[in-house]
């Protein structure tokens, strides 16, 4: 697995991507082209911190970058074009209008949300992104790949603890490959 920073045309950070080699047995065909996109023999999943429409056109000025920092929003690319992105609510109160399913609150991380998880779902449909809210505010997101990736960047939560951050836990998770997770915090002070 590779983690890749994405920069706009002005050279300011604009997002982050994870890439899985095509030789891996992951992702499922259901996840190819949304949210994973094939490029250079890797399946990429990308998240943007600014409106994807400006990344390759105008980017952000030095003044905007100084004022806004790393970004203003969180967009999950969900198709072959960055414009096919889902904007994530800043406030947890905006989540009920979406398909994100409330998981559990994990100490020092926050409340986990998983996309459209169901107890009886197929793991081929398991969307590999989760959101974290702390104090009602989006404070992190992460990737959860159903593949035992070997990287110092990822964690491998034992199946015995998955119910501590996911609710419901899809039955298929217990039969699927181990999860490889990576958390990306959007705050200067994650409570770790």
Question: Where do the protein language model's features map onto the residues?
Answer:
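Primary mode marks residue(s) on the alpha4-beta5-alpha5 output face of response regulator receiver
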Residues: 1-192
